[in-house]
Amino acid sequence: MNAPLCGIWLWLPLLLTWLTPEVSSSWWYMRATSGSSRVMCDNVPGLVSRQRQLCHRHPDVMRAIGLGVAEWTAECQHQFRQHRWNCNTLDRDHSLFGRVLLRSSRESAFVYAISSAGVVFAITRACSQGELKSCSCDPKKKGTAKDSKGTFDWGGCSDNIDYGIKFARAFVDAKERKGKDARALMNLHNNRAGRKAVKRFLKQECKCHGVSGSCTLRTCWLAMADFRKTGSYLWRKYNGAIQVVMNQDGTGFTVANKRFKKPTKNDLVYFENSPDYCIRDREAGSLGTAGRVCNLTSRGMDSCEVMCCGRGYDTSRVTRMTKCECKFHWCCAVRCQDCLEALDVHTCKAPKNADWTTPT
């Protein structure tokens, strides 16, 4: 056998594992599952044994995770609201996002990161609110400590983010750890980046005690920031995501383009370029942009030129109720009238050969 053919056969097993698609986070479907914990644990498709075990042992945590799915999917949709792919979910699909995440793309990287972050956030918040039997406020934040402003006492309820991260890692990563392929490694990396993003915005809040509000004594606690901060941070990481390829031994990544830096644990990584999401494509999981609202005056991703992929747009005149003629009344209220406002709404045309024009 000649040398080129030898090289092909050496790389074939790695290539096959690299291209094997699998959307593994079927726990996302917990948002749509109701009933008792046993019903939920037994009916969410695709959970591995470790995940079902945790589900049965910690039904209260699973409820928190299920409620959190709606929160992080809403955040995903907010971040992608001006993007051709707008993080749309499919109600009857256990993968929640359909075939679009079969591709190891930037979008997949973001969804795995934001979902992992969402689990940390939901569990940690539930701990602080006393909703979980297995955790409460951070037990390590006790006694006296110092910061740049001086001495303070730990008090209140510090968010127990270490517990949230630990449980999220055990539950979310369980299925990926059973896999040895490149996609599993990619998902694990992005899951970790999502968890780290939540902790990045943990902030110290304090309350002053003393005469006339003087700060002779301070009580402080650690609190998570609003989840929007995590979402916006991961959105920036999405825009700077690093394309990688597998090492020859299949144990890690190297950058696809040697001009770029090696990804850190905070970066998002992906293997495959994204489709353009312009047209409906069942194989790619793209719903296209036909019927999407676009911004005629924008020069960004939401512009009619970019959003509609050069196909043009339709314009319709609509009316909406707005507040007008607002006046300040002493003291202390602003009173407005309800007025009808007419405005033009621009929506992307469908491809000429398309049979589907429903908005996405």
Swiss-Prot record:
> How does the record describe the protein's post-translational processing?
Palmitoleoylation is required for efficient binding to frizzled receptors. Depalmitoleoylation leads to Wnt signaling pathway inhibition.
Per its UniProt record, what CDD domains does this chain match?
Answer: Wnt_Wnt2
Residues anchoring lipid (O-palmitoleoyl serine): S212
Domain of life from the UniProt record: Eukaryota
Q: Where is the signal peptide?
A: 1-25
Q: Could you give a GO molecular-function term held by this entry?
A: cytokine activity
**Principal localisation:** secreted
Q: Where in the cell is it found?
A: Secreted, Extracellular space, Extracellular matrix; Secreted
Provide GO CC annotations from the record. Answer: cytoplasm; extracellular space
The glycosylation sites annotated in the UniProt record are N295
Alphabetical list of InterPro entries matching this protein: Wnt (IPR005817), Wnt2 (IPR009140), Wnt_C (IPR043158), Wnt_CS (IPR018161)
Q: What are the protein's UniProt keywords?
A: Developmental protein, Disulfide bond, Extracellular matrix, Glycoprotein, Lipoprotein, Secreted, Signal, Wnt signaling pathway
Pfam families for this protein: wnt
Where are the disulfide bridges? C76-C87, C127-C135, C137-C157, C206-C220, C208-C215, C278-C309, C294-C304, C308-C348, C324-C339, C326-C336, C331-C332
Function, as annotated:
Ligand for members of the frizzled family of seven transmembrane receptors. Functions in the canonical Wnt signaling pathway that results in activation of transcription factors of the TCF/LEF family. Functions as a upstream regulator of FGF10 expression. Plays an important role in embryonic lung development. May contribute to embryonic brain development by regulating the proliferation of dopaminergic precursors and neurons.
- Family assignment? Belongs to the Wnt family.
- Which PANTHER family does this entry report, sorted A to Z? PROTEIN WNT-2, WNT RELATED
Q: What's the protein called, per UniProt?
A: Protein Wnt-2
